[in-house]
């Protein structure tokens, strides 16, 4: 399988350690792997493409769906944009093997679920293994995986700040496909084949996200930027404060919500500059440490990191990571 290059050993610690922090995951919270596993950070066969929402997001998603030729798998927490549902139906009608997994508890999915089922698109509710199926990703033709913080809802297409990536690396795609296949089987009452995530680049809840994201923050040597809807998990909060204490240049942008009053006070008291999001709604879950970015669906809460189905990944290639860093700089300048 994949192994760490020497350069990347210095970037992050191996993820085989036992979970630590304010509270560990429940015993049944890791159905798809025994533990965090190794960091599968050998160089990708090709650098991923990164993108930022909302500008051009619906057009990008439309193009990706329309480009599917053989298979299209979609797992989405919230799906309300009927125009994208229409493109999925069109893909099915032109012979693409389409499957869609939706969170069963979000009432916002009802209209699109009915539309897809009515058009004979195979559609299942996510399994009850998780508190929420909060992941947002696509697998296209077994050749590309789209991993992101965006839902397929109207606000994501028009007014939310989000980040995503498209990876065509075979290992990334295979791991994402395995996660989908497991949840598809479990959602249909079939015996799921556990996804083999013993060595993966992906950040997956419930099995490795808490450890990996905390370790990633701890790996920061000179610079750490955070742009998040909220930060509620104690281990993540502590790791950010500790980064500041060891001399890392830390900046944080938070959504302007009362939910963030406590963490804003904590960070400010420890000398961390914190700004409220500008003209957009901040739905992102972004970390950038020393030029390496994390993008994905994981909010920084104990439920998201240990009990939900979530999916994210690291972008350690300079060119696509720079796209994300530049957007953070723009948002920092526009926030207050």
Residue ranges and their predicted role:
Residues 326-335:
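Short, low-complexity, Pro/Ser/Thr/Gly-rich segments in the mature regions of secreted, periplasmic
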Residues 229-231:
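Long, repeat-rich segments with strong aromatic
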Residues 34-69, 75-220, 234-325:
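HKD-type phospholipase D/PLD-like phosphodiesterase module
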Residues 1-38:
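Ser/Thr-rich, Pro/Gly/Ala-heavy low-complexity intrinsically disordered linkers and tails
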